[in-house]
Design a protein with these regions (language model features):
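Residue-level detector of flexible, active-site-proximal loop/helix-junction positions
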Residues: 38, 125-128
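Conserved SAM-binding loop
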Residues: 1-90, 103-108
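Short acidic/glycine-rich loop or secondary-structure boundary segments that cap or lie
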Residues: 88-90, 127-130
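Conserved S-adenosyl-L-methionine
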Residues: 116-126
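Short, hinge-like loop/turn segments at secondary-structure boundaries
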Residues: 28-31, 96-99, 136-140
Length: 163
């Protein structure tokens, strides 16, 4: 959120009151607790919306995309990141309570169905795809799958929030 402040007023929204409290304690006073499925925001309010690794957690992703379309100004930008490819589904998806992974074509179809115009779609970390796939296959074949713990259980140093 700190980085985005140079572009204008930043409002953070999270369904978790703990996350909102963390942001407020970190100096981000414009934060609110709300569900992405029904945002307490007027139509066409934002020129830039970021939703980074959130959509895959929500049961009704279409409702959320319609909400984003509603609160985004005409010619505004919505920046989304989501995990890719169902065949990469793994323990981390279960731990993080993901509902799905997307292909670019699946995500584009949903965005268009919500009335959004797509400027650009790409896969991040595409070079790591073969390594990730091979690693997961190897662990599954050799039985070396170690049970993962939630990354949210660990306490991280405060300075990491400023990177």
């Amino acid at each position: 959120m700190s980085y985005l402040k140079k572009f204008g007023q930043v409002i953070g929204i999270d369904i978790s009151s703990d996350a909102v409290k963390f942001c407020r304690d970190s100096g981000h006073k414009y934060t609110m607790c709300a569900s992405a499925e029904k945002l307490p925001i007027k139509d066409e309010e934002f020129s830039l919306i970021t939703m980074l690794d959130v959509l895959e957690h929500i049961e009704d992703d279409m409702q959320v995309l319609h909400e984003l379309a509603r609160i985004c100004k005409p010619n505004g930008i919505i920046l989304l990141t989501v995990p890719a490819y169902r065949f990469l589904w793994g323990d981390i998806d279960e731990i993080c309570k993901h509902k799905r992974r997307y292909t670019a074509s699946e995500l584009c179809a949903r965005l268009r169905a919500a009335g959004l115009h797509i400027e650009r779609v790409s896969y991040m970390n595409a070079l790591l795809l073969p390594v990730t796939w091979l690693s997961r296959r190897w662990k599954a074949m050799t039985g070396k799958n170690k049970p993962l713990k939630s990354p949210f259980e660990k306490k991280y140093p405060a300075w990491l929030s400023h990177i």
